[in-house]
């Protein structure tokens, strides 16, 4: 029997984790995370990691497995995720992959595209421009060079932004053109479930999640990491805004408002990315779990 990877996608705060746990428990299997921030053991509240009770219900892989001091990229993740899946498939016919990072999901399902070697002088030049002119100028440049990537990637993440620009400039081809086609054959079949809902309801969920993060101690967590804010892993929603609050650029209310706004924008980019994943079945958070299981079993048996 061909192994099956049940992949759960969707925007931030929509309820992917709880669905993944239900499915993993039903099929008596394990979960591999595809979240680009939950690797880091120092970042907890701001990354909305599964809570201890959730982690105890089902074995999770690639959560809290790295330090923010470690160098860790998408190529490393692809290898680690596949190794985890191979280990799971030794004892199970089914595994679960869940996350909101589209590039990480794609790396597991399709494999990474081969991108030519990058001119390091171009990389240095882009980082210099970032330092001198700020992130908005680089965002505008990417919008001109590669509007698809501009709408898909997290353009507020300097590392992701620089990566898209350095590839586009070095190769004279849009970064997005290297991410279009499956390159590697996998030893499993993929069943994709997308979870989403009405935009206003989703935005309410996002705003509520941010409020909960603040109540649970996000400000204190970020203050403890402030001296490490130069690390690329901390250039991310939830932490960047609190750092600006610490520096006096934002009041607390402005900080919270910015986190909510940037999270909503991120959700929009996530959905743009996930539209490119074929054969996805989309559901809403008020799903009927028995119907989901029936759908999965039909695909497994056929």
Regions found by a protein language model. Give the residues of each.
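Phosphate/pyrophosphate-binding catalytic cores of soluble transferases and nucleic-acid-acting enzymes
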Residues: 1-302
């Amino acid at each position: 029997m061909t192994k099956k990877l049940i992949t759960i996608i969707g925007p931030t705060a929509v309820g992917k984790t709880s669905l993944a746990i239900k499915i993993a428990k039903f099929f008596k299997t394990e979960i591999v995370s595809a979240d680009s921030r939950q690797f880091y053991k120092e970042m907890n509240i701001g990354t909305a990691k599964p809570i201890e009770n959730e982690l105890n219900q089902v074995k999770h892989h690639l959560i809290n497995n790295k330090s923010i001091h470690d160098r860790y990229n998408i190529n490393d993740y692809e290898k680690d995720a596949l190794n985890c899946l191979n280990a799971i498939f030794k004892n199970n016919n089914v595994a679960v992959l869940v996350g909101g990072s589209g590039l990480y999901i794609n790396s597991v399902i399709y494999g990474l595209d081969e991108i030519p070697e990058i001119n390091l002088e171009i990389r240095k030049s882009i980082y210099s421009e970032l330092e001198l002119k700020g992130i908005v100028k680089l965002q505008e440049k990417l919008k001109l060079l590669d509007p698809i990537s501009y709408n898909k990637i997290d353009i507020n993440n300097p590392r992701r932004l620089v990566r898209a620009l350095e590839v586009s400039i070095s190769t004279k081809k849009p970064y997005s053109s290297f991410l279009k086609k499956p390159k590697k054959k996998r030893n499993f079949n993929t069943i994709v479930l997308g979870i989403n809902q009405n935009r206003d309801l989703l935005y309410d969920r996002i705003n509520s999640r941010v409020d909960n993060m603040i109540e649970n101690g996000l400000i204190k967590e970020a203050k403890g990491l402030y001296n490490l804010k130069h690390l690329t892993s901390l250039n991310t929603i939830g932490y960047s805004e609190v750092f600006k609050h610490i520096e006096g650029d934002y009041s607390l209310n402005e900080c919270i408002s910015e986190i909510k706004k940037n999270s909503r924008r991120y959700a929009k980019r996530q959905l743009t990315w996930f539209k490119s994943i074929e054969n996805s079945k989309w559901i809403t958070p008020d799903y009927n779990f028995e119907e989901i299981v029936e759908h999965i079993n039909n695909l497994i048996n056929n």
